Amino acid sequence: MRISGAEAVIRCLLAEGVDLVYGYPGGAIMPVYDELYKFQDQLHHVLVRHEQGAAHAAQGFARATGKVGVAIATSGPGATNLVTGIADAQIDSTPMVCITGQVGKHLLGSDAFQETDIIGISTPVTKWNYQITEASEIPEIIAKAFYIARSGRPGPVLIDITKNAQFDEFDFSYEKCTGIRSYHPKPVLNLQKVQEAADLINNAKKPFIVFGQGIILSEAEEQLKRLIEKSGIPAAWTILGLSALPTDHRLNVGMVGMHGNYGPNLLTNECDVLIALGMRFDDRVTGKLATYAKQAKVIHFEIDPAEVDKNVKTEVAVLGDVKEALTALIPLIDKKAHDSWHNEFKEKYKIELDSVINEELAPTNGKGISMGETIEMINKHSKGDAIMVSDVGQHQMFACRYTKFNSTKSNVTSGGLGTMGFALPAAIGAKMGRPDREVVAVIGDGGFQMNIQELGTIHQTKVPVKIVVLNNEFLGMVRQWQELFFDYRYASTVMINPNFCAIAEGYYIKSRKVTKREDLDAAVAEMMASKDSYFLEVMVEKENNVFPMIPTGACVSEIRLS
């Protein structure tokens, strides 16, 4: 079958099972959009309002479904506008394929209109990228792109296609990629290392499990549950590990990290064996590396060899797919309870409950609405069944600390890059990927204005996303740091905001503003009952700080409750 390169792009996407893409047309990608028009009954294109929105929507889709998200843009600024989303996907291991148009082959390097070296620009933030200059390359390269994006430790791939390659015709055939000779995404599991890990775990007096997004990416949630229930080991999640285990599981002791729970952070430095499952020991988890878990023997289950011993020295490294590794490990583990060790976590939780949590979820200080009680009200009406999409800042930490999760792939947030403006487009992608689930986007007044234009995408597509803006009229997280570490010098963190509800109404999205605590319950109930998109602005306490907190560069044992 002889077809154009542009048609080949569409047929390749369909062959990979893609039925939804996010993008924004432009000159260098117009041949592909012309073919999209012809195939619109098979491949739905969502017109975003900014290419960064396309990247984040593709991320949200991927995070909520486990499938590869796809974003399309033109050359020049279209391509560069994708880069922040690509970088976010890279550090958070999100499978994504981005397709960009490029000037014709004969114009490369001539500084032609809307020409940028997107391959050079994106190299540090992609798992792989490639520029196609001949139509005949398209099937093989796109097949490789999807294989690389989803295999091993997932990540983003960018394919740049010159305009001549889109127009030229060739004899088309497609074969999915199942392997690349020089690329080995999944290390072969070493059963001797699994046995060594089991021996350490069985002999431990105070073992502690910290699990990350690797559990979700590997779909190892059931293996995690079986391991902790058999071993009796307390388990804590990282910010991207949220929802891999139900919040109310009896062995779930909370979240580690800068704004995680008091007990898991403090007791990291008291455990004798630390078992890390599908997480990368980033600085927000470890605090001061020189003092992190130095008393413990560390076991690291990890698919990416580059992460082993990168930050934390391990006693045993088990390389490979974490689902496969845990399946091999569980039969070797002794059944235990570790009751006295669990009691230490319970004691620390009681301290946090009395000093932080109770007041945050049900304030008695006479001040305004807290972010925590707003999240708790969402829990009340979602019953833990919603997908929570959070932006970046204080509200993100409150959402991650207090959202109730019943099932996996329910937490979508920007973890490693910390990208403000992530949540609104990511929520669009999450809802389109999982139309059977309620999707709630919780956003600060600062981050909301970074991609506020995607309200237009919601209006055009009628995707029923619930949007909650927690408005404290500050860049709250920066302000908190200025209060604690810069003697209340609030430099450029005060926000003079527009009428958000009027803007939402301008996009024909029903809106409501809450300024009084007594109105919060009814407003959240109305939002969650709506079958359409809904915008809820909650005016929260202006200087509502998020605690506990490990100051930057401090030891996890120096976690502050106030």
Which stretches of residues belong to each language-model region?
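Generic enzyme active-site microenvironment
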Residues: L158, H300, V389, V442-I443
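Thiamine diphosphate
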Residues: I99, L107, F113-Q114, D309-L319, ...
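Phosphate/pyrophosphate-binding active-site segments
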Residues: S136, Y174, Q295-V392, R517-E526, ...
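N-terminal alpha/beta PP-like core and its mobile active-site loop of ThDP/TPP-dependent enzymes
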Residues: M1-S340, M377, H381-G384, P464-V469, ...
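A glycine-rich phosphate-binding loop feature that marks nucleotide/adenosyl-phosphate handling sites
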Residues: D160-A165, G393-H395, E541
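Active-site diphosphate/adenylate-binding microenvironment
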Residues: A6-D19, G27, V32-Y37, K350-P425, ...
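Active-site nucleophile and cofactor-binding loops and adjacent substrate-binding regions
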Residues: Y24-G26, H45-H56, A71-G78, T133-E134, ...
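A generic structural signal for residues located within well-ordered alpha-helices
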Residues: P154, E219, I369-E373, F422-L424, ...
